[in-house]
Amino acid sequence: MPSLVVSGIMERNGGFGELGCFGGSAKDRGLLEDERALQLALDQLCLLGLGEPPAPTAGEDGGGGGGGAPAQPAAPPQPAPPPPPAAPPAAPTAAPAAQTPQPPTAPKGASDAKLCALYKEAELRLKGSSNTTECVPVPTSEHVAEIVGRQGCKIKALRAKTNTYIKTPVRGEEPVFMVTGRREDVATARREIISAAEHFSMIRASRNKSGAAFGVAPALPGQVTIRVRVPYRVVGLVVGPKGATIKRIQQQTNTYIITPSRDRDPVFEITGAPGNVERAREEIETHIAVRTGKILEYNNENDFLAGSPDAAIDSRYSDAWRVHQPGCKPLSTFRQNSLGCIGECGVDSGFEAPRLGEQGGDFGYGGYLFPGYGVGKQDVYYGVAETSPPLWAGQENATPTSVLFSSASSSSSSSAKARAGPPGAHRSPATSAGPELAGLPRRPPGEPLQGFSKLGGGGLRSPGGGRDCMVCFESEVTAALVPCGHNLFCMECAVRICERTDPECPVCHITATQAIRIFS
């Protein structure tokens, strides 16, 4: 195709070339060749479709210059008359001079505009496909947790919605999200994150305004909020795997329980009706006692107690939100049976515990299972009534509470004290307990404790296949050591083991922390 165009140009301009050579100027011939080459390039661009056909120029209507012939095919039928001898040099010189700058201007500008449009379109496409990364900070790590959602459900939905990659900060880092994607997608994701953070801030602010000094205020009239303090090591035990235990307690008691965070005090906040709140507290205490083998000691740790000596903390609660009770139970789940066994035990209904005002023993050492332990050590176990008032003195109007021992001791305790050593080592039962305990006979194995005679009933049921204590080989097995759980001892021997300087189980040699009575 280019060869045909060149041949056509040469045929149209052949005669004019001869006339042009008449002037004998090599410079004019060079200009004509450059003009033809430029026109050839423009014709090729037109054939390729990258430009429009060039428009005819204004100077091509005149006397047939060599530059105007390709754009105007009718030029050859108008031959110029032979000029005079002096005029020919001026005409060819002026015609190329006037027509030389015109042909490249208009077609070249059109092709340049077309090429510029193509370049700009490619540049815009390149810019649109490029990714950018932007940091989106939020106020606190709590906002991060709220935006991410449970198991990342919210942040995954945001990634899919905005078609971006969002890197969430890990624990210990600054609360800053890294968003990567197209510029408009990144802007959309940024707006979504900031909106979610502001929404969470508003919710927390409204909650703090309506809340009490310690925690959330009741949502409905008649509801109360209490705080139950537990040891640090059992917070995870109460919460359970993936919160299963605390959810079960909430469902069973119809309450709302806020679990403590890692950087705060181990205090559970329970909100609900007064009766439901009390039941939830009981469930938490029972769960701790069953799983650890230890009873949750209050020791004024629980802000719910009305008798707390910490007036500063207690005064922060309004009287309207405090549940008033006649007395505090050491462990509320033990109310169902009077002998302190957890769950349903085969105990006669006659074993009804007296009121706390009738108990003569001290409730140290965990405050419940072993009365008298810690002050006077073995005195209560050997029948000596303590003169110190009980821990819950003044709460005689409390509900009947289960206790393990009464102030009256069994005859076997007295005989064991007599065999233990001379009267000078401890207070003698004959001299300090009164004459009514001096001549008590020794209790044979299997005989029920006489200490429960004041409570009524016929005595404990004898366990099947009664085993003897592996220490004294006289009394039946009625106690077990914690934490090993070996139930091979009578209660007296188990208590003696725990009273040693280095208490350990005779079977497994594990340190014993306490002894508990067992029932079959």
UniProtKB/Swiss-Prot annotation:
Mark the residues carrying the PTM Phosphoserine. S338, S462
Q: Which InterPro entries match?
A: KH-I_MEX3_rpt1, KH-I_MEX3_rpt2, KH_dom, KH_dom_type_1, KH_dom_type_1_sf, MEX3, Znf_RING, Znf_RING/FYVE/PHD
Q: Where is the composition biased (Pro residues)?
A: 73-91
Q: Which residues cross the membrane?
A: none
A Pfam family it matches = KH_1
Q: Where are the zinc fingers (RING-type)?
A: 469-509
Origin: domain of life: Eukaryota
* Gene Ontology CC entries for this record: cytosol; nucleus; P-body
Comp. bias (Gly residues) = 60-69
Output the SUPFAM superfamilies linked to this UniProt entry.
Eukaryotic type KH-domain (KH-domain type I) (SSF54791), RING/U-box (SSF57850)
Q: How is it modified after translation?
A: Phosphorylated.
Q: Where do the segments described as Disordered lie?
A: 49-111, 412-461
The record's keywords, sorted A to Z, are: Cytoplasm, Metal-binding, Nucleus, Phosphoprotein, Repeat, RNA-binding, Zinc, Zinc-finger
Q: In which tissues is it expressed?
A: Highest levels found in fetal brain and testis. Detected also in thymus, salivary gland and uterus.
Q: Name one GO molecular function term.
A: RNA binding
Domain comment? Binds RNA through its KH domains.
Query: What protein is this chain from?
Result: RNA-binding protein MEX3A
Species assigned in the record: Homo sapiens
Q: Which gene encodes it?
A: MEX3A
